[in-house]
Amino acid sequence: MKEKIAYLGMGIWGFCLASLLAHKGYRVVGWARNPELVAQLQTEHRHPQAPDMPIHPNLSFTTDMVEAVDGASMIVEAVSSAGIRPVSKQLKTITDLKVPFVITSKGIEQHTGLLLSEIVVEIFGSQASRYLGYLSGPSIAREVLKGCPCSVVISAYDPDTLKKIHHAFLTPKFRVYPNSDLKGVALGGALKNIIAIACGISDGFQFGDNAKSGLVTRGLHEIRKFATIMDCRPDTLYGLAGLGDLCTTCFSSLSRNTRFGKLIAQGFTLEQAKAEIGMVVEGAYTALSAYQIAKHHKIDMPITTGIYRVLYENLDIKEGIAALLQRNTKEEYL
């Protein structure tokens, strides 16, 4: 019998990785709350956001979480960062988490400032840490679905858990590199979305590639400072989970965070831009948490602060840009 993997969350990213695992020969059961989405997947055998990609026969769908996780040797999540707490609470009523649990979402919880892995540990208890894994890196879902080469990192606290997850996801075209700095991997994936919004704003004003490269470089500097204060390894941020993911998200026309920033530059409000994108914009969610944490720890993060103020304090976007451009320049160091 084929080894079973449960996949929680069937947005385009969840569908993408669930399809990858199905093609590797696993029996994958994808769970989603939305009964209409599940019915569409079951009857049309296409995902609405990837209608040109047929569903692999090893991949099935359900709205019943018990059915999804029963007998699974691994559980993978791809819900929004705002959704991981309620989904984890629901999962806790079903299992005590005795198999690898892989987080593939990117964000920081608002108001608590917790990483997604920390939310899971809070709900399941400290013993859950040994089963936690985190997959992150430059991975646009549509490119992965098409079979384009891609490199990501997987991190876990426990060596056996890391080995199992690494084996499950690795393919000749989906290159998976182990990394022991789980917190750094998580922060790199979360914070780069804020910088991507700034790059989208730059695109919206047609500031050009020079300006965008400056934002990416200074944005990486902000991310590194933040992660260092949070006891992460700085070198993690120069790898796939940091610089790699940052470049892809900031320069890809498929990035929803960059497209969101472009809409903000065009005069859309926060809610209008989110509605126009039609999918979760994690950078908008994370900007609030990152700003609050940076303020508490007195971390100077001018790009993050500017995005927060534009989105949540109604700062005029041109004033925000002017404030960034008028800052004193200091000796560059990374």
Swiss-Prot record:
Write out the pathway annotation from the protein's UniProt entry: Membrane lipid metabolism; glycerophospholipid metabolism
What does the record list as GO biological process? carbohydrate metabolic process; glycerol-3-phosphate biosynthetic process; glycerol-3-phosphate catabolic process; glycerophospholipid metabolic process; phospholipid biosynthetic process
Keywords, ordered alphabetically: Cytoplasm, Lipid biosynthesis, Lipid metabolism, NAD, NADP, Nucleotide-binding, Oxidoreductase, Phospholipid biosynthesis, Phospholipid metabolism
- Which positions bind NADPH? W13, R33, K106, A141, R256, V280, E282
**A Pfam family hit:** NAD_Gly3P_dh_N
Catalytic reaction list: sn-glycerol 3-phosphate + NAD(+) = dihydroxyacetone phosphate + NADH + H(+); sn-glycerol 3-phosphate + NADP(+) = dihydroxyacetone phosphate + NADPH + H(+)
Q: Give the positions the UniProt entry annotates as the active site.
A: K192
One cellular component term (GO) for this entry is:
cytosol
Name the predominant localization: cytoplasm
Keyword RNA-binding found: no
Superkingdom as given in the UniProt entry: Bacteria
The answer to whether keyword Secreted applies is no
Which subcellular locations apply to this protein? Cytoplasm
Q: Where does sn-glycerol 3-phosphate bind?
A: K106, G137, S139, K192, D245, S255, R256, N257
Q: Kindly list the GO molecular function terms attached to this UniProt entry.
A: glycerol-3-phosphate dehydrogenase [NAD(P)+] activity; NAD binding
Top-level enzyme category: oxidoreductase
Q: What is its EC number?
A: 1.1.1.94
- Give a short account of what the protein does: Catalyzes the reduction of the glycolytic intermediate dihydroxyacetone phosphate (DHAP) to sn-glycerol 3-phosphate (G3P), the key precursor for phospholipid synthesis.
Its family? Belongs to the NAD-dependent glycerol-3-phosphate dehydrogenase family.
Q: Which HAMAP family match?
A: NAD_Glyc3P_dehydrog
Q: What is this protein called?
A: Glycerol-3-phosphate dehydrogenase [NAD(P)+]
Gene name?
gpsA
